[in-house]
Amino acid sequence: KGIDFDNDLTKVAKMYMVMIDDGHTGIWTSNALIPLGELTKNTRGTIMEEGADIIMTNPPFGSKGKVKDQNILSEYDFGFAWKKDKDTGEFEKGKLLAGKKGGGQVPDILFIERCLSLLKKGGRIGIVLPDGDLTNQNTEFVRAWLKDKAQIVAVGSLPQETFRPFGAGIK
């Protein structure tokens, strides 16, 4: 099962499923980051009722820009600014990132949260992310959030050439 924003890619995925005799249902064209209630009833029901044992994803990143839609950002913890308390070292949730010049959130960060929300308890995620999501100082809140919500079992690196045309280093 899967969701992709690109209609051509969903057609290719459905055709591939037919070729390997796996049917052609369970692939939908949609923005996977929109609030789950806005997905079609068929898509929403399948995803929300069953959950996923395994999620494999390569969310958009690199030069794709930020998500600035308040409707989308408000659905996510990562749609808000996070500030580290100097005394406690804990992160505090601040204002919605939309509306400010340069505001918004990169989609790969939002996809981390979306994937965890769709996963069954005990499920696993394989996700391709830019190096900085797990290493940059300005994404420390992401690591803190992940530490609280999930267990990172492994981080691997791919050769720099893998995504060079897209302008991003990856993990």
Model segments located where?
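Intrinsically disordered, low-complexity regions
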Residues: 3, 38, 80, 100-103, ...
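Mobile active-site "lid"/loop adjacent to the S-adenosyl-L-methionine
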Residues: 61-110
